[in-house]
From Swiss-Prot:
The chain crosses the membrane at residues 33-53, 77-98, 113-133, 178-198, 226-246, 288-308, 320-340, 347-367. Heme 1 (or BL or b562) is low-potential and absorbs at about 562 nm, and heme 2 (or BH or b566) is high-potential and absorbs at about 566 nm. This is Cytochrome b. SUPFAM superfamilies: a domain/subunit of cytochrome bc1 complex (Ubiquinol-cytochrome c reductase), Transmembrane di-heme cytochromes. Component of the ubiquinol-cytochrome c reductase complex (complex III or cytochrome b-c1 complex) that is part of the mitochondrial respiratory chain. The b-c1 complex mediates electron transfer from ubiquinol to cytochrome c. Contributes to the generation of a proton gradient across the mitochondrial membrane that is then used for ATP synthesis. One of its GO terms (biological process) is mitochondrial electron transport, ubiquinol to cytochrome c. The cytochrome bc1 complex contains 11 subunits: 3 respiratory subunits (MT-CYB, CYC1 and UQCRFS1), 2 core proteins (UQCRC1 and UQCRC2) and 6 low-molecular weight proteins (UQCRH/QCR6, UQCRB/QCR7, UQCRQ/QCR8, UQCR10/QCR9, UQCR11/QCR10 and a cleavage product of UQCRFS1). This cytochrome bc1 complex then forms a dimer. Heme b b562 binds at H83, H182. It is a multi-pass membrane protein. Keywords: Electron transport, Heme, Iron, Membrane, Metal-binding, Mitochondrion, Mitochondrion inner membrane, Respiratory chain, Transmembrane, Transmembrane helix, Transport, Ubiquinone. The gene is MT-CYB. It comes from the Eukaryota. The lineage of its organism: Eukaryota, Metazoa, Chordata, Craniata, Vertebrata. InterPro entries: Cyt_b/b6_C (IPR005798), Cyt_b/b6_C_sf (IPR036150), Cyt_b/b6_N (IPR005797), Cytb/b6-like_sf (IPR027387), Cytochrome_b (IPR030689), Cytochrome_b_C_euk/bac (IPR048260), Cytochrome_b_N_euk/bac (IPR048259), Di-haem_cyt_TM (IPR016174).
Amino acid sequence: MTNLRKTHPLMKIINSSFIDLPAPSNISSWWNFGSLLGVCLIVQILTGLFLAMHYTSDTMTAFSSVTHICRDVNYGWLIRYLHANGASMFFICLFLHVGRGLYYGSYMFLETWNIGVLLLFAVMATAFMGYVLPWGQMSFWGATVITNLLSAIPYIGSDLVEWIWGGFSVDKATLTRFFAFHFILPFIIAALAGVHLLFLHETGSNNPSGLCSDADKIPFHPYYTIKDILGVLLLILTLTSLVLFSPDLLGDPDNYTPANPLNTPPHIKPEWYFLFAYAILRSIPNKLGGVLALVLSILVLAVIPFLHTSKQRSMMFRPFSQCLFWILVADLLTLTWIGGQPVEHPFIIIGQLASILYFLLILVLMPITSLFENNLLKW
């Protein structure tokens, strides 16, 4: 009798994706983050579902409903903090996943990479709208500042902002629609992740060397299932430690003050995972210029495959490109730090220099260095 997992229409899909999938024998732990992102998404959808059962998307009761979840609902505090810190873990895994793709040249799988960029935008949109829902001071003012950026779009800007707000300011209509979008987007993300995997399995995984691995493949199960389980356990350990020991470490104290349109917080800033983009936005004095730089800071990822000038795919054997990659990482950490600082000297100039360096590295220095390394091969 033939094996059910190889014949049953549903099991066949699971089998070819997670069991009998031929995988390169040399992929390192940097390849774990795809599965970790899947786990993060499941955790976020489940905790979010239970939070939605008790949350009310009304300006009068939103803040107190979150308080009610934390105080009166059984393990509500745990669900709420798992959801809030789960978002941070999601972004840590996302940044490492994208970084891996950049380092090892995974962006050469064009369709997979572009769906990935789309996923990044979708996750960022979801996280932004989720941050508005508790209706604290930072929620309200963050929503006001970020949505207001759209007014920089020529001609239609002001109308567009009022259309998104559902009125003349961030109010009940805005909160209700943000809740609706925040609820539906994770399911769209899950569907996009399925398409992301579909395109990946058309080509097979890349590997650290960047060389073709067709001659040396091993089945995904048991080798990489065991490896992924280790990653999942470490993720759960980190997340639970964060939730149980210092749940507010990555949050903003201002969000424990109910939203007040008449009182502006001294420093309006987003969650830590948006600070690098926020720093780039603030480093340009012009409003439209800042908005364009903000969008391009993420959209630049879509251009990277076309700027690949090296004869080698991975950076494994390219020491100069490796140096630039780690400078880029340091630059992003600097931008993240600057995004959380007030707009004053010396932070303004540091932010501007870091923003210039960010685009310079990706668009100019890395392609030129790759060409230089190609010439080194001839020596």
